[in-house]
């Protein structure tokens, strides 16, 4: 079978080694003669899976001991509600920084529970889309927290700065598309959340990192399944968790540790991004309209000079084993999502195709 490289923005490509192990264990996991999907989440065998997954995740991100790690349902959109419901306390407003589609979606959801103070960080510099630096973000004095999205998958925009707003500012961040792709200082955040389907594992699992002093503040109307304290008190098993996604994510964590951890992923991701953006920048046939300082290393949108060629590009790239390159319906064009599981050879195959396509159609 020919090598297939999946550039989907999520659910995304998983490491080949992880898929192979899951395949081998599918019908007889841990010598039990059953699948991991069939065992009780409260049985000792799965409890071991859960504990190892949390330990490995903590190791990968150097999560401080005063932070809790929760394995949840609901995805990023669930957390758009969970964050205000858990963190507002007796306050009625929170700061939200709008830098793209997902930040705006979080703001829309937050309006159900509080009055967001919205700071529009989007700017245009020399015709390119960019984000104002953090030093220019205008925060209010009475906000319960500040929320932002470090990587916008649709816009192809990244905010790589580390928050430094002082100890009194609780920072909440949607790391769904950039978690584990680069080192982060967890101690600078109050809440970090991430849907699993991009850099962690399959869809269905959401991971939350929350500073323990923020627990116990949930609104009385907060659904129990979104209440951080209840989830923490029940070991993330208040109800039946997505066990297969949890198991597969645990395999991904072990794969990451065996391959140099987050520091090594950071280096490889930089190489992949430089290779792809290099082909785009050295061409009049392809274009990316994001300022270099804010370009995403995870999601690279680009347009062809002649949009009439889009359909042919997608057909020929798919035939070449380069899948899921169609851009989001909001922006059109193409998008290559190059998360941790995408090997350098996959990006090389894409850039080789792009160069050849331009030669024939440019």
Curated annotation (Swiss-Prot):
Cofactor(s) essential for the protein: pyridoxal 5'-phosphate
Enzyme Commission number(s): 2.6.1.52
Cofactor mode of binding and number, as noted: Binds 1 pyridoxal phosphate per subunit.
PTM annotation (N6-(pyridoxal phosphate)lysine): residues: 198
GO molecular function: O-phospho-L-serine:2-oxoglutarate aminotransferase activity; protein homodimerization activity; pyridoxal phosphate binding
Keywords recorded for this protein, A-Z: Amino-acid biosynthesis, Aminotransferase, Cytoplasm, Pyridoxal phosphate, Pyridoxine biosynthesis, Serine biosynthesis, Transferase
Description of pH dependence: Optimum pH is 7.5-8.8.
Binding, L-glutamate: 9, 42
Compartment annotation: Cytoplasm
Positions contributing to pyridoxal 5'-phosphate binding: 76-77, 102, 153, 174, 197, 239-240
GO biological process, one term: L-serine metabolic process
Chief location bin: cytoplasm
GO cellular component: cytoplasm; cytosol
Subunit field text: Homodimer.
Purpose of the protein: Catalyzes the reversible conversion of 3-phosphohydroxypyruvate to phosphoserine and of 3-hydroxy-2-oxo-4-phosphonooxybutanoate to phosphohydroxythreonine. Is involved in both pyridoxine and serine biosynthesis.
Family that this chain belongs to: Belongs to the class-V pyridoxal-phosphate-dependent aminotransferase family. SerC subfamily.
NCBIfam families for the chain: PRK05355.1 (NF003764), serC_1 (TIGR01364)
Protein name: Phosphoserine aminotransferase
Gene: serC
């Amino acid at each position: 079978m020919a090598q297939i490289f999946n550039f989907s923005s999520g659910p995304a490509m998983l490491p080949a080694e992880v898929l192979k192990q899951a395949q081998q264990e599918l019908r007889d996991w841990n010598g039990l003669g059953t699948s991991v999907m069939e065992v009780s989440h409260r049985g000792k065998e799965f409890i071991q899976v859960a504990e190892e997954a949390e330990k490995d995740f903590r190791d990968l991100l150097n999560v401080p001991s005063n932070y809790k790690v929760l394995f949840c349902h609901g995805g990023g959109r669930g957390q758009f509600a969970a964050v205000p419901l858990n963190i507002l306390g007796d306050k009625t407003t929170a700061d939200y920084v709008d830098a793209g589609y997902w930040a705006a979606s979080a703001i829309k959801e937050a309006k159900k529970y509080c009055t967001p103070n919205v700071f529009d960080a989007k700017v245009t510099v020399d015709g390119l889309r960019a984000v104002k630096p953090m030093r220019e973000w205008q925060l209010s004095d009475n906000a319960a927290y500040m929320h932002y999205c470090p990587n916008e998958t649709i816009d192809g925009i990244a905010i790589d700065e580390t928050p430094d707003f002082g100890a009194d500012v609780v920072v909440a961040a949607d790391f769904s598309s950039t978690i584990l792709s680069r080192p982060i200082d967890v101690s600078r955040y109050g809440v970090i959340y991430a849907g699993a389907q991009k850099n962690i594992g399959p869809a269905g699992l959401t991971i939350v990192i929350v500073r323990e002093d923020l627990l116990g503040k949930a609104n009385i109307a907060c659904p129990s399944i979104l209440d951080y304290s209840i989830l923490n008190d029940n070991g993330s098993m208040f109800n039946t968790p997505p066990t297969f996604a949890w198991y597969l994510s645990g395999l991904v964590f072990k794969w990451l540790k065996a391959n140099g951890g987050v520091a090594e992923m950071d280096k490889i991701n930089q190489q992949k991004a430089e290779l792809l953006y290099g082909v785009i920048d050295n061409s009049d046939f392809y274009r990316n309209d994001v300022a270099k300082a804010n370009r995403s290393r995870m999601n690279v949108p680009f347009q062809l000079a002649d949009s009439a060629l889009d359909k042919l590009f997608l057909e020929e790239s798919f035939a070449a084993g380069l899948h899921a390159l169609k851009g989001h319906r909001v922006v059109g064009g193409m998008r290559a999502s190059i998360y941790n599981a995408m090997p350098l050879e996959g990006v090389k195959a894409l850039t080789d195709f792009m160069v050849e396509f331009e030669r024939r159609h440019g």
